[in-house]
UniProtKB/Swiss-Prot annotation:
Cofactor(s) the record lists: heme
UniProt induction comment: By various alkanes.
Primary enzyme class: oxidoreductase
Keyword Ribonucleoprotein: no
Record's function text: Together with an NADPH cytochrome P450 the enzyme system catalyzes the terminal hydroxylation as the first step in the assimilation of alkanes and fatty acids. Preferentially hydroxylates hexadecane.
Entries under PROSITE patterns matching the protein: CYTOCHROME_P450 (PS00086)
Any single Gene Ontology cellular-component annotation: membrane
Protein name as it appears in the record: Cytochrome P450 52A2
Subcellular location as annotated: Membrane
Transmembrane segment boundaries: 14-33
UniProt GO MF annotations: heme binding; iron ion binding; oxidoreductase activity, acting on paired donors, with incorporation or reduction of molecular oxygen, reduced flavin or flavoprotein as one donor, and incorporation of one atom of oxygen
């Protein structure tokens, strides 16, 4: 058969052309990657994982684990199943695209700080924009810098130190606990209501008062506008949906259902109500407002409705969810660890008194910071249960990470432009090389040991680098105040000894307990 006959025979076989083109592309890409490694001083990855299906099974497997409450521990377990778990940087495919996963502190430091400009949020804006728009958590570059400069003054010490604003909400919270008369109840559900009440008061100038309901003989007349109904449920649904979109990476657009759009609209209507109220105020009226209101301060900087709504919703996610999740894990662990609860109660008694002798007026931003064991308890919960357990960045250029390559795994590895790097704070915080053989145990005393004074990038409860959480002091102050007040007010804290441990975790944009924190408190 002549060459002309071969060409005529196969010229109409389009799939042959596609196959040849694919082979040529793969060969070229292989050698180009080798060239980049040589140019940047990188070595091949020591370890990789595959599902045998070019990564098409992975995202659906992850979403299945998410719906079961086992996603976080499943991804952590994958790092333990590496041929060499001591070199915790590897690749795995999602939809045939290689993803890099790491929990190596030097690599995380590079991503978040020393090579900050080499990485961006990638597709996060597309994942989250339907709910959160253009806010500090969804933007990169100049937009992010502008958002941060706008929001930073709102988290100055004088704003985060106003703990007395929490006390009216705590009094309602106590009523909910007492109505159970020592029986088991889910305190996590109450924490989410408490933090949305306090967050909306801080952000909007008035609380949604979600804790006030008929079960404790209190009517909620705070929400008297159209758009109030179902706000919390809509917010929860949309956040859960966003987490699923993030797991799909570049295929996020598959998840864009009708209910998701309806819930986003409800949340936006809720925020728009407060934005319009604030915009109706004149500059003189804004200056004369009593107390501090986050929204009013933003209105002094911009009158753009979209900007105001987006920034408020971004901060509401952080202000409500991170603190509620942290408090839930704190009381879950205190209830199952009486030794720690008793030791913490002793410190609180010494500092502020208990029960009828409680000196609530002495609880302040400054006095809370002097509670060393309380600080250790919070740190230990943030170590075992970081609010954002997993995150990712996307390379903006061809670059490297310091560890994971070569025969010993200690050489730099190549990160291609557009490649996703996932990092697990949850797994890094459980690294036995760093935290010892008891790394999986809840032991606050470790925070008084010399080793924990020099953790650096091995402890990242609030992220790190230029994008470190602006509201970390706000969250810690609120969590500290609530913990102190609850232990002052109630002397008994227990849990069913048959409660599953380690608990299942809910993974939305932040982490919480999948089955709630079911305790007895009286």
């Amino acid at each position: 058969m002549s060459i002309q006959d071969i060409v005529e025979t196969y010229s109409t076989k389009w799939y042959v052309v596609v196959l040849v083109a694919l082979i040529v592309y793969k060969v070229f890409d292989f050698f180009y990657a080798r060239y980049l490694m040589y140019k940047l001083g990188a070595k091949p990855f020591l370890q990789s994982q595959t599902d045998g299906y070019l990564g098409f099974r992975v995202p659906f497997e992850l979403m299945g684990k998410k719906s079961e409450g086992t996603l976080i521990d499943f991804t952590y377990q994958r790092t333990l199943e590496l041929d060499n778990p001591d070199i915790p940087t590897f690749t795995f495919p999602i939809f045939s695209v290689l993803i890099i996963s790491t929990l190596e502190p030097d690599n995380i430091k590079a991503i978040l700080a020393t090579q900050f400009n080499d990485f961006s949020l990638g597709t996060r804006h597309s994942h989250f924009a339907p709910l959160l728009g253009d806010g500090i958590f969804t933007l990169d570059g100049a937009g992010w810098k502008h958002s941060r400069s706008m929001l930073r003054p709102q988290f100055a010490r004088e704003q985060v130190s106003h703990v007395k604003l929490l006390e009216p909400h705590m009094q309602v919270f106590f009523k909910h606990i007492r109505k159970h008369h020592g029986q088991t109840f889910d305190i996590q559900e109450l924490f989410f209501r408490l933090t949305v009440d306090s967050a909306t008061e801080f952000l909007f100038g008035e609380s949604v008062e979600s804790l006030r309901d008929e079960s404790i003989g209190m009517l909620n007349d705070a929400l008297d506008f159209d758009g109030k109904a179902g706000f919390a449920d809509a917010f929860n649904y949309s956040q859960n949906y966003l987490a699923s979109r993030a797991l799909m990476q570049q295929m996020y657009w598959i998840l864009n259902g009708k209910k998701f759009k309806e819930c986003n609209a409800k949340v936006h209507k809720f925020a728009d109500y407060y934005v319009e109220k604030a915009l109706e105020l004149t500059p003189d009226q804004l200056e004369k407002q009593d107390g501090y209101v986050f929204l009013y301060e933003l209105v002094k900087q911009t009158r753009d409705r979209q900007v105001l709504r987006d920034q408020l919703l971004n901060i509401l996610v952080a202000g409500r969810d991170t603190t509620a999740g942290l408090l839930s894990f704190v009381f879950f662990e205190l209830a199952r660890t009486p030794r720690v609860a008793n030791k913490l109660r002793e410190e609180i008694e010494d500092k502020f008194g208990l029960g009828q002798d409680a000196r609530v007026e002495e609880i302040s931003f400054e006095s809370l910071k002097s509670c060393e064991y309380l600080k250790a308890v919070l740190n230990e919960c943030l170590r075992l249960y970081p609010s954002v357990p997993q995150n990712f960045r996307v390379a903006t250029r061809n670059t490297t990470l310091p560890r994971g390559g070569g025969k010993d795994g200690l050489s730099p590895v190549l990160v291609r432009k557009g490649q996703t790097v996932m990092y697990s704070v949850y797994a890094a915080h459980r690294n036995k090389q760093i935290y010892g053989e008891d790394a999986l145990e809840f032991r606050p005393e470790r925070w008084f040991e010399p080793e924990t004074k020099k953790l650096g990038w091995a402890f990242l409860p609030f992220n790190g680098g230029p994008r470190i959480c602006l509201g970390q002091q706000f969250a810690l102050t609120e969590a500290s105040y609530v913990t102190v007040r609850l232990l002052q007010e109630f002397s008994h804290l227990t849990m069913d000894p048959n409660t599953e441990y380690s608990p299942k975790k809910m993974s939305h944009l932040t982490m919480s307990l999948f089955d709630g924190a079911n305790i007895q408190m009286y």
